[in-house]
Amino acid sequence: MKTTKIYDIIGIGIGPFNLGLAALSAPIADLDTLFLDQSDEFNWHPGLMLDEVTLQVPFMADLVTMADPASQYSFLNYMKLTGRLYKFYIRENFFIFRKEYNAYCKWVLGQLNNCLFSRQVVSVTYEDAVYRVTARDTRSGETNTWQTYKLVLGTGTSPYIPAAIKEKSLKDVIHTSQYLNHKDRLVQKQSVTIIGSGQSAAEIFQDLLPEVKKGMKLNWFTRSERFFPLENHTKLTLELTSPDYIDYFHNLPEVQRKYVLSRQSILFKGINADLINQIYNSLYAMGLNDEAHKVVLMANARLNDIQEEDESYLLTFLQVEQGETFDINTDAVILATGYKYVEPDFLTGISDRIRRLDDGNYDVRRNYTIDETCNEIFVQNAELHTHGISTPDLGMGAYRNSQIINQVTGRIVYAVEQRIAFQSFSAADLPVHLKSAVDLTL
């Protein structure tokens, strides 16, 4: 079925970023939007929905607050209307539970009428100045086509599993994103090995530590030089997730951007320092009961190979600094290998309208567009290489959505802050009195 109606925006994918865009768009009478997602319902990282695990950003990083603090879709309004605001106030903690954030997002969805789930987009074409988005209803099999002037791509990132491992299809080798789906089976194993050193790896390690008392041998290896703490909670470092720094980073040459990003991974891929301390305290307590010997932690250990052996796996590592290889046996492997953006296949029909850099990545302009006109195809969380470490940050989602809405409507619907950082990033931004010409006659 094809509709004749033309939307102002069709968003593909309904994660937190496009959901925030849907919520911020809802009150705008002259902005007609539709959002599609292939999942049956909204569920944010269900495989990592561990009890008492919190977001790494304050609650103001909800779907709308940083764009419109008075929005009916704010987290504080959610708490008020669900009768939990005073409990939240007494708790005195800016960092909300991940389960709480997921419930909040579902609450917002329940008030919107511009989001459709179970719709798998199969193609996008361009004709007569409009984009045609065709999606299949995953429940009925029916196909529908909608038309729009603008696209917002919010399909997000996908779990990354190295190709050499993925092609082997090993039963008890899973990605962290699927942890809770397999936990019942994992806790029955005699030995489990976690590979990787980010927040998810640490959360799962801490979650499995109690199983050591029941006999499990638990290993944690990472190729990183150490188990790095997340270093973005100091105030001046947090200014790297600001409009000021996005401007600075975006204006750097492509080669320089790659270099800078390679040095900033611990700013968004490290482990919460409190969690590291909790893990150490748990290990210390286990040592009192002579149980710590069942736990192995090692940095500088790169996984080189994995082979299936009967009901277990033989893992071959390289100790990077020593240049020595070693093998271990384990019954299960949990890969904390992160996430990567995968370009959707449905973009093939409009590939001629998308700008690219020399390496094939999107050439994302400062206003988050990737099309030749710089005004039609926007991206969410696909611009790490052009906009820097603020890209996956929930706290910057409302800022990016404000930019998109203002661009699409041609007016300032949501005020956007220009300068918020105390520090200067570019030499051109230094105060005038510091750049006075030197008097060469002295």
Where in the sequence are the language-model features?
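A conserved beta-strand/loop capping segment in the N-terminal third of enzymes
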Residues: 66-99
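Flavin (primarily FAD) cofactor-binding/catalytic cores of flavoenzymes
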Residues: 1-40, 44-46, 88-199, 203-442
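Redox-cofactor-proximal catalytic regions of oxidoreductases
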Residues: 44-48, 56-79
